[in-house]
């Protein structure tokens, strides 16, 4: 970058201002990254808990299903399973976590009992239906939590790349510019000082010659 800038004092001031801005930007990005990392690990715990909950409710639901199949007729079990194949509405909003847009899902309360055909069904079949409703809720929770986790992770990588670019490319480049400008300005100052000394010496030499000439003329007049 040094060869592309004009080595002037105004350019030096501009480079110093750019360096201050770049350092400030890097510090802000680091703080953002640290906050996101903290949020990421909190979400990891939530995601693991959601997965464990899904595993637990799934086991319970299949246990209920096996009991329903053992005690109720296949028609009753199928009737109640078909009753739960309708649309499952969730309330999804978008929230911002340190500037990262992530989904916020509110799971609505399920009805106490699903609609089903008027076939006589037992309590075990109804319980199995309710348990699988819990599985669906757990799946939605896992999906929402892991989506947040993925987006936060992507933002951490993006922020880290920006920090690295500033610290490894931009800031060192500005330092190079400042060193280049200072070296040129220092060289110019030395050259200007050397030139001034030469001019001063030349002027003093001429003044000395003039004084000597004047003195010689004065002595000559006195002799006459």
Swiss-Prot record:
Segments crossing the lipid bilayer: none
Cysteine pairs bridged by disulfides in the record: none
UniProt keyword list: ATP synthesis, Hydrogen ion transport, Ion transport, Transport
Origin: domain of life: Bacteria
Gene Ontology MF annotations: ATP binding; proton-transporting ATP synthase activity, rotational mechanism; proton-transporting ATPase activity, rotational mechanism
GO annotation, biological process: proton motive force-driven plasma membrane ATP synthesis
Listed Low complexity bias regions: 213-224
InterPro entries, A to Z: V_ATPase_D
Composition bias type Basic and acidic residues, residue spans: 201-212
Region spans: Disordered: 190-224
Pfam families with a match to the protein in the record: ATP-synt_D
Cellular component aspect of the GO annotation: proton-transporting V-type ATPase complex
Known role: Produces ATP from ADP in the presence of a proton gradient across the membrane.
Similarity-based family: Belongs to the V-ATPase D subunit family.
Protein's name according to its UniProt entry: V-type ATP synthase subunit D
Organism: Deinococcus radiodurans (strain ATCC 13939 / DSM 20539 / JCM 16871 / CCUG 27074 / LMG 4051 / NBRC 15346 / NCIMB 9279 / VKM B-1422 / R1)
